[in-house]
Structures are given as C-alpha cells and as structure tokens.
C-alpha cells in the first residue's frame, strides 16, 4: 500500500514497536516509518491510502484499523489509542481528520 513511499523494513520496525496494547504513539510511529521526513506530496499520498472509504477524511473507524493499513496482520488500536489519535489530529473538532489536519499531525 505504501510502496514507493515507505521502506518495508521501517514499517516492520514501527509495527513491532507498538505490538502491545496501548503502546501506540503516533509521533514515534510516524518517525519510525519515516513519514515525518517525507515531502508534503508523500504525506498526502499516505493520507489517501489510510482514507479507506475515500471520503476525504480519516474517521474514527479508519484510525482504529490504522496499523492494519500498514500490515494486514497488525493489531487494531485500542479505543483509548484511537480516541487520543483522533483528538490529536482533529483540530477543528468535526470528528474526523482532513488532509490538512493529517499533514499538520505528521509534522507535529
């Protein structure tokens, strides 16, 4: 899903680092997969991969399954992780993360 954007080894290492429930930290994850160092274009491409229903927003249900977008065998985020992730990214309070909010979150 992220070929040409992220290195497989970086993705594997990032997923391994948050295998345990409630160990997910979006800043650490973005750094480990190499997303924070990417161009604005690549960060937008990643958004559209994660926006599974192509609504133009990443909703709570998509955030819950965020890790599985990187690897089908990865765990779902816990409710606490999902809510914290959404709260961090949803700067306008509409209950979803838009592409500009996503870009700001990745670079935060």
Curated annotation (Swiss-Prot):
Keywords: Acetylation, Calcium, Metal-binding, Muscle protein, Repeat. Residues 38-73, 77-108 form the EF-hand domain. Ca(2+) 1 binds at residues 51, 53, 55, 57, 59, 62. Disulfide bonds: none annotated. It holds the Pfam family EF-hand_7. Ca(2+) 2 binds at residues 90, 92, 94, 96, 101. The keyword Calcium applies. GO terms for cellular component: cytoplasm. One of its GO terms (molecular function) is calcium ion binding. The modification N-acetylalanine is found at residue 1. In muscle, parvalbumin is thought to be involved in relaxation after contraction. It binds two calcium ions. PANTHER family: PARVALBUMIN, PARVALBUMIN ALPHA. Belongs to the parvalbumin family. This parvalbumin has an isoelectric point of 4.2. This is Parvalbumin beta. It comes from Merluccius bilinearis.
